A protein has these predicted regions:
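Hydrophobic faces of well-ordered beta-strands that scaffold small-molecule active sites
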Residues: 1, 28-29, 46-50, 73-77, ...
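N-terminal active-site wall of soluble small-molecule enzyme domains
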Residues: 1-25, 33-44, 54-64, 83-86
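Structural motif
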Residues: 22-23, 42, 67-70, 92, ...
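Short loop/helix-cap segments at secondary-structure boundaries that form the rim of catalytic
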Residues: 36-41, 88-92, 111-112, 130
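A signal for specific C-terminal beta-sheet/loop modules enriched in small/flexible residues
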Residues: 44-56, 103, 109
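Strongly charged, low-complexity linkers/loops
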Residues: 60-90
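Glycine-rich phosphate-binding active-site loops on the catalytic face of alpha/beta enzymes
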Residues: 79-85, 101-130
Length: 130
C-alpha cells in the first residue's frame, strides 16, 4: 500500500498499524522513515521513496542506516530517467534500488536497469507490456 497516498490516513505510525492489522497488506511505500521503521517492526515489506531534487537527496540515500533507523527493504528513486545518477546511487545504496517516475518506454527501462536498478516502477501500462 502506498501509505502516503491513502486519503484519510495521517502520516503517523498508527496508520501503519491500521494497514497491517485491518488491510493485511504485505508492505508499504512511503517517503517517511518513521513509517518505514514502524512497518519493519511489524514485519512488513518496505519501500522508502526518494524524490531526487538535489544532491542532498542522494546523500540521504547514502546515509541510510547511519542513524540507527531500520533500513528499508528497497529504496525507490524518482524520477528514474537519470542513468548516471542511478548508477551512483546503486553503487552506494545499502539496499536494492527501484527506478520509478517518468519511465515511458523500453529505452528508459533499459537505461535504468543498465545503471544497476534492481527493478523499474511505472504506472504506464504500455511499459508493462514490453
Amino acid at each position: 500500500a502506498h501509505i502516503d497516498l491513502i486519503t484519510g490516513l495521517s502520516s503517523k505510525e498508527v496508520s501503519v498499524d491500521y494497514i497491517c492489522k485491518n488491510i493485511h497488506a504485505d508492505g508499504i511505500i512511503s517517503t517517511k522513515a518513521s513509517m518505514i521503521n514502524r512497518a519493519k517492526k511489524l514485519g512488513m515489506y518496505t519501500v522508502l521513496r526518494f524524490f531526487l531534487i538535489d544532491s542532498m537527496a542522494i546523500k540521504n540515500i547514502e546515509n541510510l542506516g547511519n542513524q540507527h533507523e531500520q533500513l528499508p527493504d528497497v529504496v525507490e528513486v524518482l524520477p528514474g530517467l537519470m542513468p548516471k545518477i542511478l548508477k551512483q546511487i546503486c553503487k552506494t545504496s545499502k539496499v536494492p534500488v527501484i527506478a520509478g517516475g517518468l519511465i515511458s518506454d523500453k529505452e528508459d527501462v533499459m537505461g535504468a536497469l543498465g545503471a544497476g536498478a534492481a527493478a523499474v516502477s511505472t504506472t504506464n501500462q504500455k511499459v508493462w507490456e514490453l
